[in-house]
């Protein structure tokens, strides 16, 4: 009985997290649609680190990908996992992903999320913390899914490569569970619908080696 209860509790938790996960991008203010992303010349990585660091250790402050993006990172307010910044030139750290030991970075596809579509396998992703510490990752997967019911947080999703269909909960597990990694998330606009699909870009830690 205890095992079954634990399984049901975990299933309910995963479902709640899944709903939060999709609401974070789907229910964004209409005003965000009027702010079109305008990329500027990116700063050097050294200059970017100086701009975002504030002395706070273990607080994620920025993400940098050469020739693609240089975004300060804002944190979600406590108790508000649906929050996504409406400021152009920013990404938002997804607090729910942190509960899984992973890093989720959210942005509206009308703002900084546009740059997420320029990410490709093999690119280096550098995370900058408040104390200047840098953590490096490599992009390993770019996943694109069509939302079969774009206006519903309960939508099922079709993989645009292969046609696999996933539930909301299965999608959450696919992109946010597992060993430590970074997931970029934004919506895909198609056929005049800003929420037609979802884009996820996954990056794994760069292996480190020591000499004996």
Regions found by a protein language model. Give the residues of each.
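Solvent-exposed, non-transmembrane regions of membrane-associated and secreted proteins
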Residues: 31-212
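Bacterial Sec-dependent N-terminal signal peptides
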Residues: 2-6
């Amino acid at each position: 009985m205890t095992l079954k209860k634990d399984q049901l509790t975990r299933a309910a938790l995963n479902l709640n997290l899944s709903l939060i996960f999709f609401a974070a991008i789907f229910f964004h203010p209409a005003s965000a649609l009027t702010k079109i992303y305008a990329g500027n010349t990116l700063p050097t990585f050294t200059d970017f680190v100086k701009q975002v660091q504030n002395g706070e250790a273990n607080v994620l402050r920025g993400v940098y990908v050469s020739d693609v993006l240089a975004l300060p990172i804002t944190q979600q307010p406590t108790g508000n996992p649906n929050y996504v910044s409406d400021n152009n030139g920013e990404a938002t750290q997804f607090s729910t992903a942190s509960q899984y030991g992973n890093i989720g970075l959210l942005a509206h596809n009308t703002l900084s999320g546009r740059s997420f579509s320029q990410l490709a396998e093999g690119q280096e992703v550098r995370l900058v913390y408040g104390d200047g510490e840098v953590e490096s990752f490599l992009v390993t997967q770019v996943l694109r899914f069509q939302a079969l019911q774009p206006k519903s947080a309960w939508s099922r999703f079709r993989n645009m490569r292969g046609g696999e269909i996933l539930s909301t909960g299965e999608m959450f597990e696919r992109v946010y569970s597992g060993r430590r990694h970074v997931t970029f998330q934004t919506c895909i606009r198609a056929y005049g619908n800003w929420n037609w699909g979802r884009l996820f870009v996954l990056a794994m830690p760069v292996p480190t080696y020591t000499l004996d």
